[in-house]
Amino acid sequence: MPLLSVEKINPHTTLLLWKITETEEQLKGQLPENVLKTIVHKNYKSSSRRIEVMATYALLLSYLKKTSVIVHHKSNGQPLLDGFHISISHTNGYACVLLSTQNVVAIDIEYHSDRIARIRSKFLRNDEPFNSIDQLLVIWSAKETLYKYFSADDLMFDEMKVESISKSSLSMINLKTNEKRKVFYSLTSDYVLTYII
């Protein structure tokens, strides 16, 4: 598993990012039986989805230096891991995990694609005048991250607003509660990654 980065964001929070190159069979060989049973029980239809989930478990086991770890999920899909606040995301051959021992966190990763321009009306508000593919990718991912962060609010895209964008972050507001958050981002030719700490 080619780990691209382990970034210690602050003393309590770590961001893990890696490129998934393994086959499903290779990943099965890295996971304990109880983890494989959990994955089989979830009955993922897509092979690529199973690979992403297996890669996430392989990374967590390696990073946490444990022989077993199980990620549980709330009914809304939010992941739970004993001893940590955790957020997980995957896209076309990449996966990321954000772990914190103290604070709620959220993360999203999306592959770089021009398709975002076709769906802009799905996630952009009329008062968000952004046009470039890069801006649209960052905003799409940032709204996915904000949605995860405020998961209890069950936000719709039009209930999240971008107030400003800088070189490495966005200022965003949850319009249901008027709570503001800074969403950090990283943009490459392969993906955009956004997170809240």
Question: What are the functions of these language-model segments?
Answer:
Residues M1-V105, I109-I197:
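Core catalytic alpha/beta fold that binds nucleotide/phospho-ligands
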